Amino acid sequence: MPLKKLESSNNQTIIAEEVALLKEMLENITRRMIGDDAFTVIESIMVLSEKQDYIELEKVVANISNQEMEVISRYFSILPLLINISEDVDLAYEINHQNNTDTDYLGKLALTIKDLAGKDNGKDILEQVNVVPVLTAHPTQVQRKTILELTTHIHKLLRKYRDAKAGVINLEKWRQELYRYIEMIMQTDIIREKKLQVKNEIKNVMQYYDGSLIQAVTKLTTEYKNLAQKHGLELDNPKPITMGMWIGGDRDGNPFVTAETLCLSATVQSEVILNYYIDKLAALYRTFSLSSTLVQPNSEVERLASLSQDQSIYRGNEPYRRAFHYIQSRLKQTQIQLTNQPAARMSSSVGLNTSAWSSPASLENPILAYDSPVDFKADLKAIEQSLLDNGNSALIEGDLREVMQAVDIFGFFLASIDMRQDSSVQEACVAELLKGANIVDDYSSLSETEKCDVLLQQLMEEPRTLSSAAVAKSDLLEKELAIYTTARELKDKLGEEVIKQHIISHTESVSDMFELAIMLKEVGLVDQQRARVQIVPLFETIEDLDNARDIMAAYLSHDIVKSWIATNRNYQEIMLGYSDSNKDGGYLASGWTLYKAQNELTAIGEEHGVKITFFHGRGGTVGRGGGPSYDAITSQPFGSIKDRIRLTEQGEIIENKYGNKDVAYYHLEMLISASINRMVTQMITDPNEIDSFREIMDSIVADSNTIYRKLVFDNPHFYDYFFEASPIKEVSSLNIGSRPAARKTITEITGLRAIPWVFSWSQNRIMFPGWYGVGSAFKRYIDRAQGNLERLQHMYQTWPFFHSLLSNVDMVLSKSNMNIAFQYAQLAESQDVRDVFYEILDEWQLTKNVILAIQDHDDLLEDNPSLKHSLKSRLPYFNVLNYIQIELIKRWRNNQLDENDEKLIHTTINGIATGLRNSG
């Protein structure tokens, strides 16, 4: 019997009760705000939406005044948000229940390690596996931080629903508190008045570490070690999960990312993790009241206690407390040294006893900062050993064990920061350096071979830098060199791990990578033997992915590159772009090209004796590589995951996965289990069939790519259709991120960033990037020969990659709505442009029919009943928002709204994104 997934709970009764209660409270609050007469409009809208009487719904919405629109759009935006919270609460409950009752589920770590423990290389795999979720600031998290904080309070209250219902806590008081928070959220601005700055994005993402990720990663790593030990495997400091971050270092297309934001990103991380340690030490100080008259500590604990400046007269016989005080004092000095300021108390989870803890360091016996996390851990280990010597092993568990594990994982910062820049920027900077040094006057005009010759000569034979104080530099070059200089300083200060990778967007040639090496050399991060920052190419378009094999083969053939890779444990990371490849060639072409590229790049690495590891640039939507993480990882090519995998976590996905520590634990558990299972298991039923499967896919994908590009790039009306029949213009003005919607002025589809492209197709409910071109391509293959449908059905049943590919299309189609999409099409100004919709509609219907035929299903989402039920319960609410949005866009474009009313459109964008849950 296959194990069930816990993607969402099956306890629909509880969810229904909670949603009914939340809806009742929201209705009462809204009635009080607008009155009974106005609320009847909301009630009539709901009835029409549930009956799917969209013609009448459109008429009613058209007669709502701008003033009434504000509360009505807010109501229908808040309602899906409350439903989300209820579902998340129940998922967290289900996760705890399954773990505490020792129930098996798909991806459960205990099962994964049990299966692996019996293999000869099981211990090696468990020690080496490393999964790295990389949190990014891509602008798809439309909710304000304030709204997220309020939803956290509601989440905590709903966790108590069962207790309130059973009378364990006072039901009436519980209802009153819940009502208060819903009232607050209903009367709080949903949309930001001003665009986020990078510093806001850094601060915002830190709340996930402070609130859930530190605890979840620490708990999971401890459980990982304990499970291995249970099966006789003693692991030496494994790191199954470490975190990565782009915020503050990703300057591709974002002029607001600077040397200052890079420094701030690292500094705030140190502040948060050191505050966490300080809080833990405060808790240990309060509880470790062991008296030396009863338990004699070892000499090292006595030494630590003697160095404490705790002035309390009551601590004379409490050496452990004084030892913890001394350690905490050193942490405070460390925080001052690393952040250049005292603790800012970003968290308030544990207060400090200032009379005992704030004693200043005396001049005679100054408290010194820790030189490294190793020294901090050594002091904790001394306390652990003393407890073991006295038979107090039980006292080690809890806060002491947790903080020791956290030090092993995080050290003095939370996540390794990636730097990223577009290859064209690097080329411009290198061209300026070479010209200023009188080496090459017009570098950009050289051939690829000539470029590599010039760059290699500088890297291998010239120890001096190209830049000189005597030569004036452009603002761009100054800014880039400042960022690299800051990176070097941070590595010197916080350790090599704080910045490990630099990603090159739009890598198209070997010279792109050597150009980055030149820039790194300028600040001392690269020399002939060593690269302190790994050079990571990002292959994004279909063409670049097709060329990736040859590019990497040429790059890896150079001796200097092999020297650099050798300093990185013989790993070479390659980033794969899901977004641009999809925008370039459609869903099938993107997915298949990425699959083949991994196979080819893995083989090239083996030829050169290099371990190729992949960094998957996945977004929240299927059109940007999204979908269930477990399925996405286990459907990767066998052999493509060595012992390390990185993947981006973006936008609203961060809140969905990591907003709660229990759900965060579960998602991290899925990532580890999926990675291990993919490393050791050939998932396909019969590996001998893979060659024939590949031939079939090559044929289908070629057709799909042609069909997709014919509409997107060859139809002269498609560009206007996208810009007129979607809210792209309104999305671009929404204050949801620090980065512009395009790298330059948008004059064609290729110039638009993938995120607003996908986000806008989600808003108009076409979900175009997740399915267009799929139906016609499969239909052509099915019609080509008798038995082809059966072949596709067999592939779906036996090949995880193909199964995942089609399941994602199934999910996307279920969230689309062609009736609503038709209404958006009417926003287009000319009939020729509006007619593009009918091409899309025909392909949508064909895709739905073909997908169901291959799956042998009667309806969409037959394999995912919980999502099907969830969508059924929420669709009426956010379908209304689409009709409201369409009406508001009409008014806005016809100058019937003033600038203050534009936020009404933004409110609907927020609500639709909230209802869909993975929109960008």
Swiss-Prot record:
Keywords, alphabetical: Carbon dioxide fixation, Lyase, Magnesium
Enzyme Commission no: 4.1.1.31
Cystine pairs: none
Biological process according to GO: carbon fixation; oxaloacetate metabolic process; tricarboxylic acid cycle
Key word Lyase present: yes
Gene3D superfamilies to which the protein is assigned, alphabetical: Phosphoenolpyruvate/pyruvate domain
GO molecular-function terms, A-Z: magnesium ion binding; phosphoenolpyruvate carboxylase activity
Function field: Forms oxaloacetate, a four-carbon dicarboxylic acid source for the tricarboxylic acid cycle.
NCBIfam families (alphabetical): PRK00009.1 (NF000584)
Family recorded in the similarity comment: Belongs to the PEPCase type 1 family.
Descriptive protein name: Phosphoenolpyruvate carboxylase
Name of encoding gene: ppc
